[in-house]
Structures are given as C-alpha cells and as structure tokens.
Amino acid sequence: MKLLNKGAEEIKEIEGKLTLLEQKFPGCGEKPSDGDMSVPAENGKPIEKDDLKKFPTFDGKDLDGNEVKSSTLFAKNTVTVVNFWFTTCNPCVEELADLEALNKQLAKKGGAVVGINSFTLDGDKTAISDAKNILAKKGVTYKNIWFDSKSKAGEFTSGLYSYPTTYVVDKNGNIVGEPIVGAITSEKQSEKLQKLIDQAIANSKN
C-alpha cells in the first residue's frame, strides 16, 4: 500500500511539472505537421501580425563573410524566399535540395532563395562551419546569411516557434501572406508557397 501511495505521489509531481511546462511553452509537445520541428521562442513572445508587414531590416554577412544588406538584397529580386533553418533540424536539412531546385527556378524569374541558419547568428564560427558542410553535402548554392542576434532581424528569428519556417518577401521588403511552417516538400506546402511567390512577383510589377 505504501508503494502505491508513493507511486501516486510521484505521478502527481510529474503531472505538475508537465503542467508548468505547458504553461511556459504552449506549443511544446504538440504533434508537428508537414515535417516541422517545433521549438519554443527564446523570448517566449509570439510574433505579432503587425510585425509581419515588413521583413526586419538587417546589415549582415553571408557565410563567406561578404556583407549583405536587406535593403539591396530584396530590391534586386522580384521575389525572395527566406528559409529559416538550423543544422540539427532533420526536416530543415531534408528540404535543402528542394530549396536549391526552387532557387534555380526563381533565378529565371529574377528571384532567389536565401537561407538563415539560426545557429549562425552573431557570426558563430563553429556554427557557420557546420552549416557550410551540410550545405555543401546537399549541393546548395543559394546565399545563406547571418546577422546580429540583438538586431530587429535577430529578435524576429528568436521569435520563431517552428523550424523550418519560410517567408516570401517582395522587392519592397514586404512579407507576402502568412509564413509556410514546416517543410515545403509536400504537395500541399509547395502549392501554398507557389501562390505566395506568384503574388510577390505580381507586386513587383506594380
């Protein structure tokens, strides 16, 4: 009987801890869909819809150390597909080949794919090296960039709850529609992404 009582107390203690975790990280523990790896935001704050109208400006660098500014990056493309990923996220790595194929398709229309590996923020040398190794193995040629984690773009990145997450940005730096949460490899996700791309290209003609 004592063993049963002790077991019941331990179960209650575990349930209490789980409740606290769910309150702190409401998205944690939910079953991911379309190949996404859900993680809590570092600052615990959701991204407000008003903040999604413009992609946060940044002065960053690519993984080879070349300077990249958001103002010129978006302006030179009819559409920019921005993919947030990290090195140990399997769904992120698995879709790299699809993103590379997409980049080649967009190039014909004056567009491009840009990757942002959240581990490489602040120019972390080890993270950059790891990311470059994976990108090379997957045959990725499109630009991957990093910026200061304390910048507006860095805070935006920290506010993401799921990876991979993909945004479509027009040439004026406006975010088009809602982000694609999860890998783009499924037909449903691919169709959603294509509609946003078409809209962004249409915006660039106005």
Where are these regions (language model features)?
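N-proximal helix/coil linker or "cap" segments that precede and/or mark the start of modular domains
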Residues: 1-59, 74-77, 129-133
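A short beta-strand-turn-helix
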Residues: 58-80, 105
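Loop/turn elements at helix/coil->beta-strand transitions in domains of secreted/extracellular proteins
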Residues: 75-80, 107-114, 138-143, 171-174
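Aromatic-flanked redox-active Cys/Sec active sites in thiol-based oxidoreductases
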Residues: 83-89, 118
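C-type cytochrome heme c attachment motif
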Residues: 87-94, 165
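Structural microenvironment flanking redox-active thiols in thiol-disulfide oxidoreductases
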Residues: 94-137, 149-154
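Short, internal strand/loop/helix patches
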Residues: 129-172, 180
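Thiol-/selenol-based redox modules, centered on thioredoxin-like
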Residues: 168-206
